[in-house]
Amino acid sequence: MHQTSNIRPLKASEPNSPMSRRSFLAATAAVGVTATALGRDQGPSPAPTRYPDPNIVVLDKRFARYKVSNTPIQRLYTGTLWAEGPAWSGVGRFLVWSDIPNNVQLRRLDEDGHVSVFRSPSHYTNGNTFDWQGRQVSCEHGTRRVVRYEHDGKVTVLADNWHGKPLNAPNDIVVHPDGGIWFSDPGYGTLGNYEGNKGELVIKEAVYRIDPNGGKMEIVTDAMYKPNGLCFSPDYKKLYIADTGATHYEKAPKNIQVFDVIDGRRLGKGQEFTHMDLNGKAGLADGLRADVDGNLWVGAGWVGEGYDGVHIFAPDGKRIGQILLPEICSNVCFGGPRRNRLFMTASQSLYAVYVETQGAHIS
């Protein structure tokens, strides 16, 4: 197990797990905008995009270095109802993501682009990630729990209650090199039957840490309205959390907060990292990931043309770029053999674009 004292950003060529890809696939088999953005043909045979892609927008010169001039934004798959939770398996070389209303997880193989149903039913899974042993960890709306899929196909329940009271509906999830699992619990999956099972929220919305030694749960913060997407900085010294409480709380901010991580286990007092206002309009940040330089790539939307897609923020909190999509972007992750491809779940579709940076973490 990795120790906190040895934490460092991943290198591009570093393997994610000691397992071989062949053995990993065998194990998982046991488990079963602008006018331009809106007008682009995203059908099965779209017209070619003239380079540079006009929907990769530089807002600050610092973003120019991350834009690949001769690559397009590609729609890799469509047909979902609300796509969420993209996670890259470096061992299996595949992407998994959730289609929450359809109660399935989907998998896309990197080598040939084949997409198939990975798990059905998925218990209305939302966020997914992979741990340091290559095991998938997921947030289930329908059962209000966090689970880990073992290599032999068994399911281990990591969390389903707080002091005997059911969780709200775990949403997004990340892993720490010490083996700890951190997840948000805003409760969207219990607000209706479309993305889970309608029920009552009986505990405060919060972010939790599951200790790797014994599985003890702790609240690391409950100071936000509805904590949603979350990610660590490259050195794991900071935790960024998107607050989407404005969906249900009138006074809730539309922002991303940042917290100091203390001893790898606790959080210091949070403060605003950035707000989601752009040109007088404010949407919501959702899922987010950090690159090796500490920039945040944030799925955003609910405004429309010229806003929906991915917003990129420098470590100082300034918005430096956008990737405009014709759909609301719920979440992102870096993947591909070199971790230089940004995958974006966006409402009914999965998109991807190559970038001149790499993801800071394993999934």
Where are these regions (language model features)?
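A short loop-to-beta-strand structural motif that recurs across blades of beta-propeller domains
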Residues: 104-106, 145-147, 206-208, 255-257, ...
